[in-house]
Amino acid sequence: MNFQLKKLFFVLIILLFVSTAGFSQKEFFRSQQVFTKEQLSDFYSSITIQDGLVLFNANDYYLYAYDKNDGSLKWSVETNYKSTIPVFVQDSIIYAGISKKEIHQAALFSLADGKLIKTLPFGPLATKPLIKNGMLYGTAIYDYGCIVAYDLKKDTVTWSRFIAHGYSRPPYYQQNKIMANAEADNWVELDYDGVLLDTTCAVKPDFFVEAIPCVKKFTALSHDGLEIKAKLSADIFGKDFIDQPDIITTKNFTFVLYNDKLSILSGRLKKKQQVQVSSLVVELVENDNTKLVKADNENVWILYSDHLLQYNHKTKKLVRLTNLTTWQPHSVLFDEENIWLISGKDGLLYGLSL
């Protein structure tokens, strides 16, 4: 091999290394809990960020609030409840789960100091609620799984509708109606008074909820409100879809991750792109902890084999590969140029600068 060929070969090797090497990151925060083996063997934990606070529902049944800028602990409260579902915050009120004498309930806490305001007459919220005109609409463990309407001022459940395991799927809250899941691809239309809107029964359900005679059949709604169903659903969600869909919508796109396949829909359910995630990082071995983290109109971020992938779906190129194997992330949350994660190794909360 002559000198010029050797030089070219060397440059190609360097470029290959640079293109696949993971980016480094700096750990600027680590929480100080010490979890027992028993607590970590029953791993339920979650995070969210609201009004400058990182809210950490930890494996020790406490809810912690940290200042996201300096990492200081603002407050902590024992809830005797832990969940992979993050707490919800609106109008400086935290909606979280609480457990007393092995009875699980939803509860309100003050965002400012963590003090318990009151418990609610139903189980912990399973999806992000809608608060509108003094009413809370949400899904919860109530009468074995319902969508409920709760009057915040009167402290009463105004109405509820049994939807079985559909309570774990976020409803679609639209201007004049709610579309709630009632297991699998069955969806029921309700008005905000809890009245069933579909009485034609053009489509009948294939589940055991007798109080819901009429449904719509689809897997999910796209970013532009169209039903993803039939052949398209089978292609992007799989033919035997029963799990929670891994889906993110932006103003212009719908992103779906199923197994190793990323599907991107543009307007009117048009398939803009499909890509095998493993083809972007052939050096990594896929594991079960693969999920969408964030997406916008140019990039999508995916947690894959303890790495964070940033994929530009406009240029169809991998932009960045961040190695997170040190922390074995259980869940990841973006905050501007930083990420917060819960380690699957020790259960602690970490803050990393990218």
Task: Describe the predicted segments one by one.
Residues 1-28:
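Bacterial Sec-dependent N-terminal signal peptides
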Residues 25-354:
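Secretory-pathway ectodomains
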